Amino acid sequence: MKRICEWAMALLFSGVLLVLMAATILLPKNRYSYYENRNLSAFPEITPESVLSGQVFDDLETLFCDYAAWRTPALKAVTWADLNVFRRPVVNETVVTDDVLLPQLYDPAMSDDDIRAQANLVAEDNAALQKQVESYGGHYCYVAVPCQYVYYEDSSPAYLTNRSRYTDLELSALTEEMNAQGVCFLDMGPVFDSLGHPPEFSSRVDNHYGLRGAYETYRAAVQALNDAYGLALSFPEEGADVTFSALPNPYMGSRTRKLMGLRGNDEKLLTAAFREDIPFTRLDNWQEVASAVYALPATEDEALTYGLYMGGDIAETCIRTTAPRSPPPSSSVTASPTPWRASPITASTRCALSTCGTIRRRASATISPPISPTSSSASAITRRSSRAATTAASPDFKQGGLL
């Protein structure tokens, strides 16, 4: 009897493996993983070198893991168990609290002197960029916007790091260096605090700030430009010039997706509507596309991602308006320190934004009404943009960049 049981178990195990392998090979494949927000592995290139080094076998293992049959339901089941059975505080690199989903953080391996040295380098780079922008007749303002884990710093469990010391030291060092270099600098942290630090200014489930946060950032930046350069830029007032409305669709923020949609899907995204239509043309990577700033879904039940705004991350977007009250084109650019988001502002239209951000990647965008807190990246601190209203530098690792 024991021998029969052993044979039965071996046959059952072999049968399950055979079914899984057959299903993995035969079922339709999708290169994109929605919940992980990444492309799955491609079939590796087989060369004598990759075979001898063993790399091809590692790549094949990754490939089979990525395309394993019923992989998504299995991941969802494991995530559900971690959330509801084991009640882990950190699941899939996401800190789970009652009110907000935050990234799992680690203290950077940087000394205080390293932080100050980086701040000095960034300030020097931005001072040179400001001088270049002003030589074109433009206007420059560096806006530091708190990213999500800074905005919800107090929501992080006490037994996990929230980088508060690093954030405080970095911001104070950057502020001091920017002021010493004469850079027009705006810290949105105190501005948000003066407005009551409402949760709608920053997403609770994503590393982006909300449309109202973008609106208040733009208001403060316009005022900073007016004060610094003696301008008279106008601003669309809520109620009179612009109204916000929430879309009924469920919102799948990046951290919600990390949790397979099992937590944090009650947040709603906003859109802005202006009292007066402002005609504009849009160019993505210098190719003209449809004049739209929202990638609206077909139905109210379709889940939204942050790609609602501008259709997602695009290397370069330029929006040109012909608004009669627009001042002559002039420019400004910003970047941000590590836990703060970049928010470059252009003064070329009544309501335009130019975005930049993370070190090691480079892009730019100019956005005009309707307001969109879109995202893009900027150049490394050792590079300088030769074009006004494009990119600036950030000393950050992953968290820099406008949301």
Predicted segments, located by residue:
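Extracellular glycan-modifying ectodomains
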Residues: M1-L403
